[in-house]
Amino acid sequence: MGRVYYINSHGTLSRHENTLRFENAEVKKDIPVEDVEEIFVFAELSLNTKLLNFLASKGIPLHFFNYYGYYTGTFYPRESSVSGHLLIKQVEHYLDAQKRLYLAKSFVIGSILNLEYVYKISADTYLNKVKETNSIPELMSVEAEFRKLCYKKLEEVTGWELEKRTKRPPQNPLNALISFGNSLTYAKVLGEIYKTQLNPTVSYLHEPSTKRFSLSLDVAEVFKPIFVDNLIIRLIQENKIDKTHFSTELNMTFLNEIGRKVFLKAFNELLETTIFYPKLNRKVSHRTLIKLELYKLIKHLLEEEVYLPLNYGGLK
């Protein structure tokens, strides 16, 4: 398994013989392509079609984020592993209202269970509400209601004010951290989807759209409590992130370069941290947890096994 690379400095990324080269006025670094799983870009980067063709041939996605750290898009290589049969099953589960609702509920249940683990808030009432919902809007409303409780708890445990969730744009440091963490999680889940036969545009909780890979939004719901909420709490409580790591421009608050690097380092370390996975009777990385979740989803779509979302607390 290759590594995830993060580019935080302006420069040029190119193909150099049979490897990758990043260079600018201060540095020239060759990166063995066999060591690269995917690349996250947070700076101005010059590249050409020769590089893109090379990345495509190696199946390496390239994720782009703008100056403020918002996810803007992915160079998504042509899928090398496709399955018409699985695509048909994905669409069938979207078109069948009950099958779609089951999967949508599952993603929300996974989100609520993992939020319950992170914030130590009883979720029984909300899990029962989820089971009683009959539509996607009802379902999303229940999740949003529980999220509000969690955000109040987030303020308590960090001592930072959230006031209310603001996304476009984030208006304070806590909102900026949530938005940045969510963007990273969406992109990482998309990178893992690429390695499977799943089509990233067919989703169940979030409405499929011509302008986004909405399946990554669905699956990310299960992982955001661990990859975002839990990480934010730890970074603030350990004083690794403070108010000096943010900038504000035009009523928008965002992580500055130093803060972004701190968050990325912690995010990447979490991806590589291992945890015992009972079903396999061995430890796996948090990155592998995403892959295993996608395989469970595939088995459900193929009607080989009923999908049950990751309950992170149950792994402990």
From Swiss-Prot:
A Pfam family annotated for this UniProt entry: Cas_Cas1
Domain of life: Bacteria
Known EC number: 3.1.-.-
GO molecular function list: DNA binding; DNA endonuclease activity; metal ion binding
Disulphide bridges, residue numbers: none
Subunit structure: Homodimer, forms a heterotetramer with a Cas2 homodimer.
Entry similarity comment: Belongs to the CRISPR-associated endonuclease Cas1 family.
Protein name (Swiss-Prot/TrEMBL): CRISPR-associated endonuclease Cas1
Source lineage: Bacteria, Pseudomonadati, Aquificota, Aquificia, Aquificales
Gene: cas1
